């Protein structure tokens, strides 16, 4: 019996006006895969894609083809024929269906990519604009339009004086933007990877086994460019397709990993067929953290199964190249030790055998920057070795890899890849103009260093608004005043008591981000007994940071993915790239160091089009000068979402929050909020640290604990002093008894 229907039977309210709590819970990310992973869709674009997928033509067919179609329809629609004729027509229809199926299978295997109908430029523009995909040619205008400018001018007008050439008007900014815009063929479905782009049959089967059917926006735009190449003179069939260098800015959880793995694997499979004897590392994928690198390897192993391609995670002590100077050193050491005894020779040879590991036999190497640099330079003791076979370098989370922390290491790896046809692709959800300029200058330097006459296009693909959060999650910015207020608000999330509609309801599993490792440890110790023993107790909450060993980190990640851990307290170690598809929300216990970090943190929920994710950010009095950039991102995200009703960020709040100077932004990005920095320099900083301490213990209890620790330390010091002054330990000799 429905109580709502009973109480509202005299009204005109619809039965579905008040959704039940069970219905609202079904919209959580943890409930399962979204029906459509795309973030931006429109009916017009769907119509164009449907027509392209079924091979329909928009114009009416005329002539003999139309007459044949009419004859076929007349033959099929014979309603008044005899029963024998109907049976014969039915058997003929079955035979025709079988023949058509066999022909279709044969066509899928043997047909060329040119036989597949391509969209015209208007259709491509419609689809790309509807999905908010913008592709731009980043090269100089002289490289983009040299042929076009010459072809438009007649031969007589080519002979000009210098004065006339100087007087020619330059393109306006609007015309330059228009000249740089590119409209490549979009990917209609994953089936096209086999029919149009001729990827490996086994790779196509592996993609289908993973359940990928509808491409996301980033896959819709990048896969045709990386598999089919970029045609410099438009979509004409006569134009030569060239694989471009690519900069991709796409929202978190939009499928960037699959977008760069499929072309890399397919390229290596083709190379294996063309040159069977040549083996080595053909692609290098660089990621900023071990967690992200291991995740890429796990996804890659699902795709390379049965293809003959090997993908490997870089580990400490692995040998990547065979250095000639290593052999020279070994031979030199052998010559110098010829005069040594046989007993000394045996352990030295065994030591050499143990110390020299075999070279890694892999096609794709996934690594963090420092590990590969140390392997190529023998822990910075020798010049960098080269990777001559590498044809693709992929920088995942490129804005971090080309930032100050990893920049030198990443550029060293890039320079070590010496193949003249090396293609680079940079991927991230946030990418500043300085990163784009650095990538552009690095590619230009390589071109000059290797005297490359052939110009490769450099394209930038942006999905949605650049450097913005995904629109399918709900953002909450909560003022907690003090550290104790944040702790109280977090406990209210864990144990919701109020029934107000405006209150935030966040169900596990979720992530909690802090600024530093000590704060993450302190918050974990404070919350570990908040979950009742009936629900699993302290085993349901864990802390993850870079001070833990690799084994501990992988074990925590495994338990969190399995669902044994519900709440994970962590630092920005997990803020980038790591894919937790079932996370219901993210809590920023400490505000992020920059707007880009906020975008990546909240992007751990709402992945692959899942709706219902919540991002809660607590801020205190000390955080007020740094909050405006986060508030702006939330405001833009809500506008992009088209959210109706009351917004979480009001205009008066945006006007009241102070702007941050460039110097302060740089300081915040490097060190975080000053009040929460772990290093203490003065008494004033000590007082600030006390105010931002994560603890609910009283001052009396803390003093008693400190006294106890001091007594234990004093006892240890006394014991060590007595042992050092023990007469039995003196070195003085005994002269015997005097007579």
UniProtKB/Swiss-Prot annotation:
Q: Name one GO cellular component term.
A: nucleolus
The name on file for this protein is ATP-dependent RNA helicase rok1
* Annotated ranges, domain Helicase C-terminal: 489-657
The UniProt entry, under InterPro entries, shows:
DDX52/Rok1_DEADc, DEAD/DEAH_box_helicase_dom, DEAD_box_RNA_helicase, Helicase_ATP-bd, Helicase_C-like, P-loop_NTPase
GO MF annotations, alphabetized: ATP binding; ATP hydrolysis activity; RNA binding; RNA helicase activity
| Source organism superkingdom | Eukaryota
According to its UniProt entry, this protein's organism is Aspergillus fumigatus (strain ATCC MYA-4609 / CBS 101355 / FGSC A1100 / Af293)
Q: Where is the composition biased (Basic and acidic residues)?
A: 43-54, 95-110, 699-708
**Matching SMART domains, A to Z?**
DEXDc, HELICc
Listed Basic residues bias regions: 709-721
Location of the protein in the cell = Nucleus, Nucleolus
- The main location class comes to nucleus
Annotated motif Q motif, positions? 192-220
The Helicase ATP-binding domain, residue ranges = 237-449
What Gene3D superfamilies does the database record attribute to this sequence? P-loop containing nucleotide triphosphate hydrolases
Write down the EC number.
3.6.4.13
Identify one Pfam family in the record: Helicase_C
Task: State where composition is biased (Polar residues).
Answer: 18-29
Describe the subunit structure: Interacts with the U3 snoRNA and is associated with the 90S and 40S pre-ribosomes.
